[in-house]
């Protein structure tokens, strides 16, 4: 009975604290972190499959997502481009119009130069869709030129969709006569958690809207 609480707690702490200390260039440390985390993940899948209720596992999924809001994306530097695009938007410019390397030559704004130095794709046009551009723009606008606040606000936006999936996925599985424990395959998946809430990659938002599609498909055939 208490095994799930022990494994769930260890899994949550390991994933979150590993994200806090992870380094993109240290492969060995990442491997030593992810191996036990994935072992914990598969143990939780096994336990949830044989448990009468999945409430505890859903609780873990929410707690981890909230905790990851307060971490820095140590395994990806893509977020600098997010805030570059947001910065361009609040200056009244089109983030798709010019490449960062073209815009920086005429900018005297210190924040622009700071973000530009951290970009991994200064020679490329933005690839992020309009919906994400709005999230980037309002994160920067609400953050008042503080990168740490921008990051926190954007993570809160992402968390709304991610936590939405925690509530949405079990409902969808029930509509399709599938066991609720199967939701944990996605909701507790370390790769999903790290990429979606840790590194701020937007695939989780797309999955949320895909899930809505399947919900409406069943509700309104």
Where are these regions (language model features)?
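Intramembrane catalytic core of multi-pass membrane enzymes that act on lipidic substrates
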Residues: 54-155
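Start-transfer (signal-anchor) and selected internal transmembrane alpha helices
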Residues: 1-68, 72
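Transmembrane-helix motifs of polytopic, lipid-linked glycan transferases
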Residues: 39-47, 152-176, 207-208
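Short hydrophobic alpha-helices at membrane interfaces in multi-pass membrane enzymes
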Residues: 2-4, 180-183, 214-221
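Specific aromatic-rich, kink-prone transmembrane helix
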Residues: 168, 205-221
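Short acidic/glycine- and proline-prone juxtamembrane loop motifs at membrane-interface regions
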Residues: 197-205
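Transmembrane-helix signature of polytopic, membrane-embedded enzymes
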Residues: 52, 56, 169-190, 220
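Membrane-water interface at transmembrane helix exits
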Residues: 20, 45, 136, 140, ...
């Amino acid at each position: 009975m208490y095994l799930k609480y022990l494994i769930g707690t260890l899994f949550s702490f390991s994933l979150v604290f590993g994200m806090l200390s992870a380094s993109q260039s240290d492969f060995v440390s990442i491997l030593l972190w992810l191996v036990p985390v994935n072992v914990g993940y598969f143990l939780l899948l096994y336990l949830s499959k044989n448990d009468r209720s999945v409430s505890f596992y859903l609780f873990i999924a929410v707690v981890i997502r909230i905790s990851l809001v307060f971490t820095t994306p140590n395994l990806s530097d893509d977020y600098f481009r997010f805030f570059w695009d947001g910065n361009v938007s609040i200056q009244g410019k089109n983030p798709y119009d010019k490449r960062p390397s073209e815009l920086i030559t005429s900018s005297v704004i210190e924040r622009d130069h700071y973000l530009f130095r951290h970009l991994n794709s200064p020679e490329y046009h933005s690839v992020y869709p309009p919906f994400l551009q709005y999230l980037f723009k309002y994160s920067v606008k609400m953050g008042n030129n503080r990168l740490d606040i921008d990051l926190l606000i954007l993570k809160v936006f992402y968390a709304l969709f991610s936590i939405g999936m925690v509530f949405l996925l079990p409902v969808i599985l029930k509509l399709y006569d599938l066991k609720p424990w199967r939701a944990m395959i996605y909701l507790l998946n370390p790769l999903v958690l790290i990429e979606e809430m840790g590194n701020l990659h937007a695939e989780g938002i797309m999955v949320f809207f895909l899930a809505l599609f399947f919900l409406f498909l069943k509700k309104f055939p």
